[in-house]
Every structure is written in structure tokens, then in C-alpha cells.
């Protein structure tokens, strides 16, 4: 089975450590914060002053559009109808006993697989950012990650490892896993997922540095050979 290793992160096994040797070299250069900007793997920078960037991002998070329960209920029939069309397109009878409820099951499952669109980062981080005079690297490893490839609509799964160097502020360890879950439970590519996790942590904490590593299996590669 092929595994792709890239710089990303997700939901954790709650094994924090401050021992940098356990991930020796993996975080170096992935995301390094400089005054007023963030830089992810050298692919572009963004930001103004640190304080302005942080506050503006939080405001954007507050007004982020999410998919509501009502949206799910309204879209479920059309989503189920689309699965019915797929079944017919595969040459199968959607009225056959084994397939009769499949469109609704599949539609409900897809809404669950993409439930990250229903959640806001600001709700996760609310009251979870703590003032703490701690300057050693915080590492959370083996966060379980489940996502959907946006190219083929098949699963991506693996583990995320996150490390950051605090700058007078820390985040509750369980919230790192929640950040991973929110961004992974969407239609994704691994590169974007990695960046979104790293940027969320960077903008929330303004740390001295952030590193995100994702080890993932892409079923679009494994199943197709």
C-alpha cells in the first residue's frame, strides 16, 4: 500500500511532548513566522502587522459562512437524487431491494464526511487560548485524520503531527485535534489541508514557529493501482 508523506496535520492521540528529537528535522522550514507574516513551505507569504493580522483573521473566522442543519435538510433530496442518477449510470436498478435506500444513505454519509463545513474555527478556539510563559516546543503526534479527495470523492486517511514554539500563548491540546477535524472533514487535497491547519494555529497563537506533518493514504491512488 502506498503512503504519501507531506507536511500536514490532523487529530491526535493526545501524546504531547517537548522533545524535539522525536520529529528531528520534520518541522524545520515548514512554517516559520517572521514579524508580520507567515510562510508555508516557501509558497507565498501573507499578512500585515502581527496584531492586525491576528485580529482581522479572527474577525473573518467569526463571519465565516457555514453549512447549517437546515442547509443539510434542504439539500438532502437533491443529493440523494444525484446518487440515484449515479446508480442508473452504472447500469443498475435503483429500485432493486439492496439499492432502494442507498441514495439516501450515501447522501447522509457524504454530509457527515464533510461536516467540517458546518463548523467554525472561532467556535473551537473560543476560550481555549491561554496566556502561558512556556517557550519549549509543544508537539502532538498521531492525530487521526479522515478526509475526502476533492478530485475523486474517495477517502484520504492518515495521521497528523503538529508542533509549535509558543510565544506567550498556548492552545488546549484537544483543540489541535479539533482544528484538524474541521479542516479534514471537507473536500480536500493534502497540500491545502496542511496549510489550513498551519495557518489556523499561526494566526490564533502568533507562535515563534509552527510545523505540520501529514502522513496519509489516498484511496484514489490505492484503489486504482
Swiss-Prot record:
Protein's UniProt keywords contain Hydrolase: yes
Ranges annotated as biased composition (Basic and acidic residues): 1-12
EC identifiers of the protein: 3.5.4.16
Pathway: Cofactor biosynthesis; 7,8-dihydroneopterin triphosphate biosynthesis; 7,8-dihydroneopterin triphosphate from GTP: step 1/1
Documented activity regulation: GTP shows a positive allosteric effect, and tetrahydrobiopterin inhibits the enzyme activity. Zinc is required for catalytic activity. Inhibited by Mg(2+).
Location within or outside the cell: Cytoplasm; Nucleus
Keywords in alphabetical order: Allosteric enzyme, Cytoplasm, GTP-binding, Hydrolase, Metal-binding, Nucleotide-binding, Nucleus, Tetrahydrobiopterin biosynthesis, Zinc
Biological processes per GO annotation: tetrahydrobiopterin biosynthetic process; tetrahydrofolate biosynthetic process
UniProt main location, coarse: cytoplasm
Catalytic activity: GTP + H2O = 7,8-dihydroneopterin 3'-triphosphate + formate + H(+)
Protein name (record): GTP cyclohydrolase 1
The species this protein was found in: Oncorhynchus mykiss
Gene name for this UniProt entry: gch1
Amino acid at each position: 500500500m502506498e503512503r504519501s508523506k507531506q507536511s500536514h496535520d490532523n487529530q491526535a492521540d493526545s501524546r504531547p511532548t517537548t522533545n524535539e528529537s522525536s520529529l528531528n528535522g520534520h518541522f524545520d522550514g515548514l512554517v516559520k513566522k517572521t514579524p508580520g507574516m507567515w510562510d508555508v513551505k516557501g509558497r507565498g507569504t501573507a499578512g500585515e502587522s502581527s496584531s492586525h493580522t491576528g485580529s482581522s483573521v479572527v474577525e473573518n473566522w467569526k463571519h465565516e459562512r457555514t453549512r447549517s442543519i437546515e442547509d443539510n435538510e434542504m439539500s438532502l433530496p437533491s443529493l440523494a437524487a444525484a446518487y440515484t442518477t449515479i446508480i442508473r449510470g452504472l447500469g443498475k436498478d435503483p429500485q432493486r431491494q439492496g439499492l432502494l435506500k442507498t441514495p439516501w444513505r450515501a447522501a447522509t454519509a457524504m454530509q457527515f464526511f464533510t461536516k467540517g463545513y458546518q463548523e467554525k474555527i472561532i467556535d473551537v478556539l473560543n476560550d481555549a487560548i491561554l496566556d502561558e510563559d512556556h517557550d519549549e516546543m509543544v508537539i502532538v503526534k498521531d492525530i487521526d485524520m479522515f478526509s475526502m479527495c476533492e478530485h475523486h470523492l474517495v477517502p484520504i486517511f492518515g495521521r497528523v503531527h503538529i508542533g509549535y514554539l509558543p510565544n506567550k500563548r498556548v492552545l488546549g491540546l484537544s483543540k489541535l485535534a479539533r482544528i484538524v477535524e474541521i479542516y479534514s472533514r471537507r473536500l480536500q487535497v493534502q497540500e491545502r489541508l496542511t496549510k489550513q491547519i498551519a495557518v489556523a494555529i499561526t494566526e490564533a497563537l502568533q507562535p515563534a514557529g509552527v510545523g505540520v506533518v501529514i502522513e496519509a493514504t489516498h484511496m484514489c491512488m490505492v484503489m486504482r493501482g
